[in-house]
């Protein structure tokens, strides 16, 4: 992010129904981004408040953080949790019970490709989309087809998925 980009904006409208009838119901104050606690270092902090829309009752954060700040250098790595990897193995087997003829899987926000690893073990072609530049090499080194970007209509066309 360069000095001219906005780090966050206050959201005054409900993201579900566009109402202005929002009220803060929880204010945790300014917080650093998730997993970015660095002992002794000055860190950027952002408002962490939960709004309730009194028209549709949707809960939402009061401030929208620039996604590049949160996701381009993502600090949580799925593969560091054995419990999560075990769950991914379970989930992939359960999923194939419902889609026994599946040959391809797409993981949106694939992180380091750990969920894709489980599907690859079951002989599926694996595709993923994730904006984390620091995790791209990890996921592609495992043989997954990854687009390092946010998921949208342009990125889906870049994948060249084979069904």
Describe each model-derived feature in a short phrase:
Residues 102-111:
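Conserved class I S-adenosyl-L-methionine
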Residues 132-134:
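Conserved SAM/SAH-binding beta-strand->alpha-helix loop
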Residues 125-130:
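Conserved SAM-binding motif I beta-strand of class I
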Residues 112-123:
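Conserved SAM-binding loop of SAM-dependent methyltransferases across substrates and taxa
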Residues 157-163:
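A short acidic, Gly/Pro-enriched loop at the edge of an enzyme's catalytic core
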Residues 85-102:
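Conserved alpha-helix/loop element of class I SAM-dependent methyltransferases that forms part
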Residues 143-156:
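Conserved SAM-binding strand-loop segment of SAM-dependent methyltransferases
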Residues 2-83:
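N-terminal juxtadomain amphipathic helix
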């Amino acid at each position: 992010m360069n000095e001219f980009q906005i780090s966050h904006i206050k959201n005054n409208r409900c993201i579900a129904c566009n109402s202005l009838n929002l009220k803060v119901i929880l204010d945790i104050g300014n917080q650093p981004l998730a997993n970015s606690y660095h002992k002794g270092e000055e860190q950027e902090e952002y408002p962490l408040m939960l709004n309730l829309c009194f028209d549709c009752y949707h809960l939402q954060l009061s401030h929208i953080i620039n996604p590049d700040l949160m996701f381009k250098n993502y600090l949580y790595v799925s593969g560091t949790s054995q419990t999560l990897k075990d769950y991914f193995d379970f989930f992939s087997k359960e999923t194939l019970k419902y889609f026994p003829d599946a040959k391809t899987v797409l993981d949106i926000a694939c992180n380091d490709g750990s969920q894709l690893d489980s599907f690859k073990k079951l002989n599926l072609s694996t595709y993923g989309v994730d904006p984390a530049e620091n995790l791209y090499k990890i996921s592609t080194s495992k043989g997954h087809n990854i687009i390092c970007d946010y998921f949208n209509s342009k990125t889906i066309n870049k994948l060249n998925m084979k069904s």
